[in-house]
Each structure stands twice: as structure tokens, then as C-alpha cells.
Curated annotation (Swiss-Prot):
Pathway: tRNA modification; 5-methoxycarbonylmethyl-2-thiouridine-tRNA biosynthesis. GO terms for biological process: protein urmylation; tRNA wobble position uridine thiolation. GO terms for molecular function: nucleotidyltransferase activity; sulfurtransferase activity; tRNA binding. This is Cytoplasmic tRNA 2-thiolation protein 2. Belongs to the CTU2/NCS2 family. It comes from Oryza sativa subsp. indica. Keywords: Cytoplasm, tRNA processing. One of its GO terms (cellular component) is cytosol. InterPro entries: CTU2, Rossmann-like_a/b/a_fold. Plays a central role in 2-thiolation of mcm(5)S(2)U at tRNA wobble positions of tRNA(Lys), tRNA(Glu) and tRNA(Gln). May act by forming a heterodimer with NCS6/CTU1 that ligates sulfur from thiocarboxylated URM1 onto the uridine of tRNAs at wobble position. It comes from the Eukaryota. It is found in: Cytoplasm. The keyword tRNA processing applies.
Length: 464
């Protein structure tokens, strides 16, 4: 591990008079090579934190850090996000969503190290009162929509397995599930239904967003079936910055605050984002320095609005790497929803007393949570969307009317096909985890309407 070699220069404990010139030269060469490979060409001659003589890569803000301090800086951000936001309790079992890219690879490494440290602390503890949280890994296989040869796909998936299995301890289980599995029924394989549903979406951006929704649904399904308490995503500041701009362009400004917080409990299994303060370039550089193997062979090319926004963010990054942080910090100033923190009774009892006041329950009067979420993407409804839903409930004659009314405006215009007949067929293809909820609502609505009609007087009834 290249970063480990930097410990010879002292890392965080090294002074300005480090004498390991040979090791420093080796680290300098490694850092320069890694920086060039990921496009980080800005180097300084010494670490701005420990003052060591090794070459330092420039991070956001212009401060140069040696390999050891650079790694400690990212790990510190990760730990701070996890602990200060109460993301993981000792009794939790956490499911890490692993894509094979640098962000999820670093998240896997860091949560693994945190668990190993917790196990060491538990072993030396006299009381051993608190258990150690568990970690599982999930990979959603989307190769059914990939045009690559099957042998290449299988080799990439095997690489995913080897990356996870290379961790000596700490991983509870490895779950590799096919995206089409959420469409499967007892009588039908899900591949045909997935392909047909995707083909019915005419908008490139809509197709990408639809697949993203299916990915979350798959992770939720894995977590529920295997007893996980949290889902940990590798979404970093760069990815969130792209989402902020793309969501704004798509007209999703009302629901945007829900997507940029550390914690999101609107889902049945809460979702946490411990890498929210880390840039993609920093995570890629750490993978290079630490020789962390990644696998991005199965990545699908982006199109539409998402691709344009990613290109725009890349241009901004070239001018000033801190622009991504600026975008994320600006979005964080928006008022979060009540589901953007854990508030269950007793949830924070294990926390140190100095942190507990931060997690006081959100007052019901201050809550902005509408309690109505989009059928597909899970976005909270705005006031206009709520009004449309209420209006539809009163005059809906068909189940399809309720289905479409429970979709946010973005999903309605970008994902749903045009035409009532097409919509009916499209909804018939969707996973039962989505449509089952609407069927329950529709049945309740029909029952209520029938009960009301029983008490209504007919036009020719004289009241006797």
C-alpha cells in the first residue's frame, strides 16, 4: 500500500526534520504518478499538516498533504459523518451498496476498518456490554441491459466478489442480485418485464432515472429480506453536486433537500451517506495511493440531462475543485425534511451525552414532510402535487388515475409513456413492491366510495 509507505516519513506524527530521504523519494514518485493518472497534477514539496518532506498531493482548498495525512483526512471525514449523525448503532446491521467504483470501494474499506476497530475495543472491554455492528455488501447486477459479452460481464462480477472477499473479516454476507429480480413473479421471469418497461420510456433521462429508482428498490428488497437496519451509499460530494443541478433542471427543487442530507429515513430501510463531504477525485486518488482495486467495467454510459450536467460539473472542477463543495453546501442550506434525521424514541441512548442534544425530535409544527411520496422515485409531494392528488381521489374512476396521481411531476413527464392505454400497460409491468401499495390505496378508496353510495339518496327517492 503506497500510503502505508508514507508512514516512514512520519505521517501525522512526523516533524519537519524527517531523514528518510529514500522513502520520501519513493513516496514522491508514487504520489506524482497517482496524481497524473487521476488528473491531479498540482503537487507541493511538503505536507501542509505534518510538515514531512514527502511530496504532497493537493486537495480541495489548496492544502498539500502527504499520503498518510491525505488518507487520515478522508477517513476522519467518514468517521465524523458516521458518528456525529448517528448513522450506525452498535446493534445495527448495515448493508453497503457496492458498485465497484472508487467511492463505494473507499466506503467499503473505511466501514471495514471501523468495524475491525470496534471489534478490538470490544475484545479488550471488561464489560463487553455493547455489541459490534455488522456489515453486508450488495451489488445490483444491471448487465441485462448491457451490450457487453457475457464472459466479460461474468469476469467483472467475479472481480467484485474478489474485492469483497479480500477483506479478512467484518463482512456479514455478499449479495449479488439481478436488477430484473424485482420484476419477477411466481409465474414469470422479470427480464422480459424489465426490458419492456424500459423500452416504453422514450426519454433518455427518464430511462436513467427509472433505473436509479429500480436500483434503490433492489437495495431495499435485499435489506428487508436479510434483516439489515441501514443502507449505506457511496454517494460523494461530486455525485451530489451533479444531482443538485440535474434535479433543479428537472423541476425537482421542492424535494431536493431530501436528497442531500446525511440521513434519509423516508424509506422502509433508512439510507445514509457517509461520503457526502468527500470529492470523487480525492476518493479516486486514495484508491490509487492505497492500491484499492476497483471494477467499473459494468458502468453504463450516461445520456440526457444527467450527462450534460456531469460534463458541466467537470468543467467547473477544472477551473476550481472546490466548486463541487460550494454547490453541495448551497443545497444544504435548504430546509431539510423531518425524515432527514433519526428520531425514534431511545435511538440515541448509546450516544455520548454531548451529542444527544443535536438529535432532539423535530417539532411537528416545523416538519415539512408531506407524508406523501412519489410511487417510483420517493420524492415528497409539493403543495400543487398534493392538491392534484386530492382532486384525483375524488373524481377517479379507474385505478390508473390513482397510479398516475401518485407520481411526481418529474416522473410523470419523463418516465410515464404518453396515453392512458400505454400507462395502464406500463404500470402492469412495474414491480409489485410499487404497485401493491397503490392497489391497497385503490381498494380502500373503492370501499369508501361504495359505503358512501349506500347512504346517498337516489334522485327519485322521496325520502320515505
Amino acid at each position: 500500500m503506497a500510503a502505508a509507505a508514507a508512514s516512514s516519513c512520519g505521517g501525522a506524527g512526523c516533524g519537519p526534520h524527517c531523514s528518510s530521504s529514500a522513502s520520501a523519494a519513493a513516496v514522491e514518485d508514487a504520489a506524482a504518478a497517482a496524481a497524473e493518472k487521476v488528473g491531479r497534477l498540482s503537487l507541493s514539496r511538503e505536507c501542509g499538516k505534518c510538515g514531512g518532506g514527502a511530496a504532497a498531493v493537493a486537495v480541495a482548498g489548496g492544502l498539500g498533504l502527504c499520503g498518510e495525512c491525505f488518507r487520515a483526512n478522508l477517513l476522519g471525514k467518514f468517521k465524523l459523518a458516521v458518528t456525529s449523525n448517528a448513522m450506525v448503532r452498535p446493534t445495527d446491521s448495515v448493508l453497503l451498496a457496492f458498485s465497484g467504483g472508487p467511492a463505494s470501494r473507499v466506503a467499503l474499506q473505511f466501514i471495514h476498518e471501523m468495524r475491525c476497530k470496534a471489534i478490538e475495543s470490544w475484545d479488550v472491554s471488561n464489560s463487553q456490554a455493547l455489541p459490534v455492528f455488522g456489515v453486508g455488501v450488495a451489488f445490483v447486477d444491471e448487465s441485462v441491459l448491457c451490450s457487453k459479452p457475457r464472459d466479460e460481464i461474468e469476469m467483472a462480477i467475479e472481480d467484485i466478489r474478489s474485492i469483497v472477499s479480500s477483506l479478512s473479516t467484518g463482512v456479514k454476507a455478499m449479495h449479488i442480485v439481478r436488477l430484473e429480480d424485482v420484476f419477477s413473479t411466481e409465474s414469470e421471469d422479470g427480464e422480459r418485464r424489465l426490458r419492456e418497461a424500459v423500452d416504453m420510456i422514450g426519454d433518455d433521462t427518464g430511462r436513467e432515472d427509472f433505473l436509479r429508482c429500480l436500483r434503490m428498490l433492489s437495495l431495499q428488497k435485499i435489506a428487508m429480506e436479510n434483516g439489515y437496519a441501514k443502507i449505506m451509499l457511496g454517494s460523494c460530494a461530486s455525485a451530489i453536486a451533479c444531482h443538485v443541478l440535474s434535479a433543479t433542471v428537472k423541476g425537482q427543487g421542492y424535494s431536493l433537500p431530501a436528497d442531500v442530507q446525511y440521513v434519509d429515513t423516508r424509506w422502509e430501510i433508512p439510507v445514509v451517506l457517509p461520503l457526502r463531504d468527500c470529492l470523487a477525485q480525492e476518493l479516486t486518488l486514495l484508491c490509487e495511493l492505497d492500491s484499492l482495486k476497483t471494477q467499473q467495467h459494468l458502468d453504463r454510459p450516461s445520456n440526457g440531462i444527467n450527462s450534460l450536467v456531469a460534463s458541466f460539473i467537470k468543467r467547473l472542477r477544472e477551473e476550481n475543485p472546490s466548486r463541487e463543495h460550494t454547490i453541495v453546501r448551497t443545497a444544504q442550506k435548504l430546509k431539510p425534511f423531518s425524515f432527514n434525521k433519526f428520531s425514534a424514541d431511545g435511538y440515541h441512548d448509546f450516544l455520548p451525552s454531548r451529542l444527544r442534544p443535536k438529535f432532539q425530535k423535530v417539532d411537528s409544527d416545523e416538519s415539512t414532510f408531506s407524508e406523501i411520496l412519489c410511487l417510483m422515485c420517493g420524492s415528497p409531494f409539493s403543495e400543487s402535487e398534493l392538491q392534484n392528488l386530492e382532486s384525483t381521489k375524488h373524481k377517479a374512476q379507474k385505478k390508473i388515475d390513482l397510479y398516475t396521481a401518485h407520481c411526481c411531476q418529474s416522473c410523470y413527464f419523463q418516465i410515464l409513456p404518453a396515453g392512458e392505454n400505454l400507462n395502464e400497460h406500463f404500470f402492469s409491468l412495474l414491480p409489485k413492491l410499487w404497485t401493491g401499495k397503490m392497489d391497497t390505496i385503490s381498494d380502500s378508496h373503492s370501499l369508501l366510495r361504495d359505503q358512501i353510495e349506500e347512504y346517498l339518496l337516489e334522485e327519485n327517492d322521496d325520502g320515505n
